[in-house]
Amino acid sequence: MAEPRVGVVVVAAGAGARYGADVPKAFVMLSGRTLLARSVAAALGCPGVACVVVVAPSSYLAEAEREAIGSAGATVRVVPGGVERHDSVAAGLAALPRDVDVVLVHDAARATTPSSLFAAVAAAVAAGAPAVVPGLPVADTIKQVDETGTVVETLPRATLRAVQTPQGFRRDVLERAHAARLSGSVTDDAALVEALGLPVLVIPGDPLAHKITTPADLDRVVGLVDSGGADAE
């Protein structure tokens, strides 16, 4: 059986309002390189990746093309994003070549994610899982509360995971999930697959797959990158 062809959708279309920069968050610098450039490099470092599609703000397409230039035999494309995250993912999915079998969806804000995590997610999908997400055990106690702030339940930590990206899917599954999406906001593509009633496998995540949401998050990873703890290539 031929190895599946892997395509990566890098979501970089958000305005990054919580970050508060004068550019979209994907174009914020981290030790001399943008978050977008680092995320694309990590995706290209995954064996078997045939295409990377960057979904960028329509007013930053030229900048995204400059930052997303890659090698390793993969094709890099840049397309404009939509109003909501799911619109942007759908645009990236539609731009992938038709012979891509496995789709990884990655947030550009997780710019220190190692290529090995991309490879692990892709391998789990290739092994038969329709949808795969990386996740880390939760260290804090998590309490469910009602609309008044009163605790309803303390959730068992052993059953909880903090989910990261890239998230991986069989292409047909992700296309079905987006086609069937109902109104309302979703925070990740795995939730759309869950709504279809299909299983989503969680594999071990990586502490390096930080999501940079605020300047404080960026400060926390600068030292890691500068010390070589995260891939700076």
Each language-model region and where it sits:
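Residue-level signal for inorganic ion chemistry
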Residues: 10, 36, 92, 106-107, ...
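Short, charged/polar "capping" segments at the starts of alpha-helices
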Residues: 58-66
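Conserved core of the sugar-phosphate nucleotidyltransferase
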Residues: 113-201, 233
